[in-house]
């Protein structure tokens, strides 16, 4: 039952054979690996924004601003994988729903976001504890769905994309911003960056040699390329699918539309 404006919903996904890659591949993540991933993500909460700012060389703010520009006043907006609310606090003038599988992330997000929206004279956001693959919300509800550095954490990316397609209104748009991997060559440079600079930054900030980013680097290693996910989106039914790197090349932005009926 909903509590404090928050809906909780979870399901168990079917495991596939990814034993040689520790439970990861471009299409998704096995249950055991995903459960550990969520635990590691929750461990990032105290330093989430600080580490992300340093590891993106300060471009995280601009990336979020770029994605927010796709939301117009009065729209119904869903953020899938809202985390601690770093993106959501900057969206103004919309009817906002924040979804995340982590109760701890939603707790932090709600505390930050409710205060900001109250100060702006806006209605409170809605909060849903659920996975992207099973969104407990009606069909054809949202004008925009945003995924900010959460898409690579989906258990089943095609199913997640299908659920987002379902809850989008006809003519609605999905915008994803996540790790940059334009092609396999670009991915090699990304792995080096994630395996050296990001690890060093995380260790300094957290003062912990076993910091969560050491484990989270796996999500990038097994993340797919632009062409892989563009194909997946078209298979689901999206049109106008586009992907491009965002300066300075550490992140990618995908855009895709649900066709008008």
Residues of each region from the PLM?
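A short glycine-rich, Lys/Arg-flanked "PGG" loop and its adjoining helix->strand segment in the class I
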Residues: 158-173
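C-terminal alpha-helical "lid/dimerization" subdomain adjacent to the S-adenosyl-L-methionine
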Residues: 28-36, 177-235, 242
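Core SAM-dependent methyltransferase catalytic element
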Residues: 230, 236-261
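N-terminal, positively charged/glycine-rich alpha-helical extensions of SAM-dependent methyltransferases
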Residues: 11-47
């Amino acid at each position: 039952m909903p509590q404090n404006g928050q809906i909780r919903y979870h399901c168990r996904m079917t495991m596939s054979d990814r034993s040689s890659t520790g439970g990861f591949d471009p299409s998704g993540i096995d249950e055991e690996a995903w459960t550990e991933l969520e635990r590691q993500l929750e461990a990032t909460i105290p330093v989430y924004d600080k580490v992300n700012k340093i590891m993106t060389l300060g471009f995280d703010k601009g990336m979020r601003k770029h994605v927010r520009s796709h939301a117009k006043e009065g729209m119904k907006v869903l953020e899938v994988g809202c985390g601690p609310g770093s993106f959501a606090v900057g969206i103004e003038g919309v009817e906002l729903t924040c979804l995340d599988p982590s109760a701890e992330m939603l707790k932090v997000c709600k505390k930050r976001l409710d205060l900001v929206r109250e100060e702006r004279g806006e209605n409170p956001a809605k909060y849903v504890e659920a996975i992207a693959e099973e969104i407990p919300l009606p069909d054809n509800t949202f004008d925009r769905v945003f995924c900010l550095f959460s898409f690579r954490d989906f258990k089943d990316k095609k199913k997640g994309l299908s659920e987002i397609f379902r809850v989008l209104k006809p003519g609605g748009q999905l915008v994803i911003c996540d790790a940059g991997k334009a092609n396999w060559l670009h991915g090699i440079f990304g792995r080096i960056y994630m395996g050296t600079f990001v690890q060093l930054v995380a260790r300094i900030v957290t003062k912990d040699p076993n910091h969560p980013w050491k484990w989270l680097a796996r999500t990038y290693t097994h993340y797919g390329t632009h062409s892989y996910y563009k194909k997946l989106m078209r298979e689901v039914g999206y049109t106008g699918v586009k992907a491009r790197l965002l300066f300075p090349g550490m992140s990618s932005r995908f855009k895709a539309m649900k066709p008008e009926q």
